[in-house]
Amino acid sequence: MKARLQISRRVAGLAVAAMLACLAAPPSGFAATVPALTVTLSPGAPDSRGDIPYLDVKIVADAVDATAGQPFLRLPLVSSNVQGIADALTGFRATDAKGPLKLTTHDDPADAPAGYRHWAADRTVLGPLVIEYRVPITNALNARGAAPPLELRTEEGGFSGSGGIFLVLPESTKLYRNAVRWNLAAAGPQAIGLSTLGAGDVTSSTPTSADALASTYFMGGNIHHFPDVLPAGGFSAVWQGEPPFDAHALMQWTQTLYGSYLKFFHAPASQPYAVFLRRNPVNAGGGVEIGHSFVGTFDKNTKTEDLKLTLAHEMVHTFVGALSGDDELGLSWYSEGLAVYYQRLLPLRAGVLSPAQYLADLNQTAARYYTDLLNDAPNDQISAKFWADTRIRVLPYDRGAMYFALLNSEIRKASGGKRSLDDLVLAMVERRWHGLPVDTAAWVKLVEHELGSRGKEEFEAMLAGKLVVPAPDSFGPCYTRTTAPLRRYELGFDSVVLTQPSRIVRGLVPGSAADRAGLRNGDIIVKPVPQDAIQADQKATLTFLIRRDGKEFPITYLPRGETVQAY
């Protein structure tokens, strides 16, 4: 999810800092030659509970042209396992230079890797095109289970969501001057708006695709913010609702850490970075990097220390990025593995994480990886099973981190301590800055330069599923490798159940903890539950709200199976 380089123009109720040089006005001729694509968001007035019930959307696209029957608009049916809201849109209407358009829709097949709803007109479409519709904000739980916090949610007069969930955008490769406008009159005099494009009304300073707006995150209404004056560049944060921790203090900590990241990655201090925080009733404490910013979540039990590591993790993504290629999940060993590796190392170097906290986080990764029954799954199975099984989903994170720890140790030894993993990562970052390929081939070439053919062989073995075991001294002189008896994670029934809207238990494992706790085939799991964090905690229990024979009741158990010796 990418989108950067923006101009900050205005934000209701806030003073906005002066424009920084990197966000200067568009170059001469830019406005005249590149068509505009403007999104205006108008949230409804909060109800008696403080919830914003709907969001009115207006999209104006210049220079649209499509023949009769040709799809020219689209909206994802599912985005990163988040159920889309195409069926919930109301008041949908579109007009072009000739007047109102009569539209028809068709959906991609349900098994399409990236399915959309497409709109077509009964006549030729000539821009400018104006689209208007209303999106309900229901706070409904994602029917598909585990997923990043992209869906529209509202609380205490604020709302947030990803453009990929609710923006109907031109189906075109054309470049636009993407712009965001906020109409916050109904939300109240103190309402503000922030997106990953910047604070308040913003216009992109370089031509970008319509898809960049789908990869934009929005939060608006009566929301909290840090610092007191939202800057046009650098660090900023907003959150909706009241977290169970001191959000200002946490954002001060994050701003300090962000400064150390800027130095490590040799990035300009003006590089914008925003943090969005909101409540998550299903998988609190997690988050997602989007538009070179971070969306984090919390609930009443979220601890500041845990969220710090999540923030540290997601900020790594902003600088490292992902490998280029079609199989995003299959390539995530790089981005997620590096994020886990550096989420504890960079804060330790910056002095904002203690050696004991570093060790605790390292052992959490190790325990989850070495007890994972599927830790020998080849990397080419990741994409197909990523959302269906938590044991597969965590492999790019855990196996990737252990691979990078092993690689760092070997590079240090081969170079007599003169080089490390840092040098390879910074070389990849520099390639990205210079527009050079940042792909698997580029990575393998760097590894071979350091370690010769052995480096390539170890890399290929990791992808093939061979267990990665760093040397005892891989994490420095203060730590060594030991073993301990730990139990494998065992859900106790078919994990695909948790990704399905009906969530009907099947494939119950006889004698498992789930079976002994009273779970039965045919039980309906009323609400989705997270597993990734529980899988990393040997003592964490699972609680399902079950519906059976018209009655609802909870079932709690420790989802653990056999004991194994783990590092």
Regions inferred by a protein language model and the residue ranges of each:
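Zn2+-dependent metallopeptidase catalytic core
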Residues: 85-91, 136, 164-167, 171, ...
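Beta/coil-rich, acidic/histidine-enriched accessory regions frequently appended to metallopeptidases
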Residues: 32-41, 58, 88, 434-567
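Acidic/His/Gly-enriched intrinsically disordered linker/tail segments
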Residues: 328-401, 414, 430-432
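Glycine/proline-rich low-complexity spacer/linker segments in large multi-domain proteins
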Residues: 135-174
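Surface-exposed beta-strand/loop patches in extracellular or lumenal glycoproteins
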Residues: 52-86, 167-170, 174-185
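A surface-exposed beta-strand-loop module
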Residues: 82-149
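Juxtacatalytic substrate-recognition/specificity segment
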Residues: 224-331
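Bacterial N-terminal signal peptides
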Residues: 13-28
